[in-house]
């Protein structure tokens, strides 16, 4: 791998983290002045979320800094120059062939993907069931907090797509740098945890945010999806699993409104 390619990926990862930190830092200022600029809630804030979660991964992919397979976009690279696509002209027919080629490339992964999905769902169910009983028996309530820049319901599909794509971007970037999938998965998770910690520190309440049930659910989803990505590095299949696991966690942990404001 050329050194300049390594530095490109490093630059994208650092820029993404700095963008998130800058957004967190600016959030209190924005909230104070939100009444003067109501259009911010309808355009500005969603635009920043899109740039952070989707913009950086897409730019790295578009400019060739990060190959598609490292993002988990299995089958995408095979579409370029595919003879089946070069012989058809109709848009509908090209779309049908494209979907067929993608599905064909996923077939070997469907078995492990289904097994890991069931396993992770079982582990999360057991973990959160035990947690609920432990909390009920102690009579205590862990701290809740609302994270600046919250992004809607935890079960919202758009929120899950954002998280799945961006987490895969961090995993894929470090996978590309290290040329080791295990290091990519572990390093990507570590980078996300560091980013969360820095955001909590900038907010001035690190312990409260990092021990909230919202953050615990985020961490559980991160670990579960990282394990699935290690064995089945396919973002197409990971996105619906991410959403289903998030709905499962939300069902198992009915809690105050901080869970309805998760930004993952």
Task: Report each predicted region and the residues it spans.
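Alpha-helical transmembrane segments in multi-pass membrane proteins
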Residues: 1-125, 215
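Transmembrane helix-loop-helix hairpins at the membrane interface
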Residues: 13, 17, 129, 142-264
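Transmembrane alpha-helical segments in integral membrane proteins
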Residues: 19-24, 117-140, 169-176
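Cytoplasmic membrane-interface regions of multi-pass membrane proteins
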Residues: 21-43, 130-149, 202-212
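Membrane-interface interhelical connector segments
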Residues: 82-99, 134-151, 176
């Amino acid at each position: 791998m050329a050194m300049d390619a390594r530095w490109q990926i490093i630059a994208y990862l650092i820029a993404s983290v700095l963008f998130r930190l800058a957004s967190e830092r600016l959030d209190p200022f924005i909230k104070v002045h939100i009444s003067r600029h109501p259009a911010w809630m309808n355009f500005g804030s969603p635009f920043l979320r899109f740039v952070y979660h989707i913009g950086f991964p897409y730019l790295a992919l578009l400019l060739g800094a990060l190959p598609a397979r490292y993002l988990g976009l299995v089958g995408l690279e095979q579409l370029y120059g595919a003879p089946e696509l070069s012989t058809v002209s109709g848009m509908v027919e090209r779309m049908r062939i494209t979907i067929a080629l993608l599905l064909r490339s996923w077939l070997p992964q469907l078995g492990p993907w289904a097994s890991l999905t069931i396993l992770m769902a079982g582990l999360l169910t057991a973990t959160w069931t035990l947690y609920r009983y432990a909390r009920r028996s102690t009579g205590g309530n862990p701290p809740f907090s609302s994270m600046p820049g919250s992004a809607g319901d935890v079960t919202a599909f758009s929120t899950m797509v954002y998280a799945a794509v961006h987490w895969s971007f961090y995993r894929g970037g470090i996978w590309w740098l290290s040329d080791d999938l295990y290091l990519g998965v572990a390093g990507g998770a570590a980078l996300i945890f560091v980013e969360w910690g820095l955001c909590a520190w900038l907010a001035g309440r690190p312990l409260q945010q990092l021990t909230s049930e919202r953050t615990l659910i985020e961490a559980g989803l991160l670990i579960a999806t990282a394990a699935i990505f290690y064995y089945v590095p396919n973002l197409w299949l990971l996105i619906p699993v991410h959403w289903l696991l998030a709905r499962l966690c939300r069902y198992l942990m009915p809690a105050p409104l901080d869970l309805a404001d998760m930004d993952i």
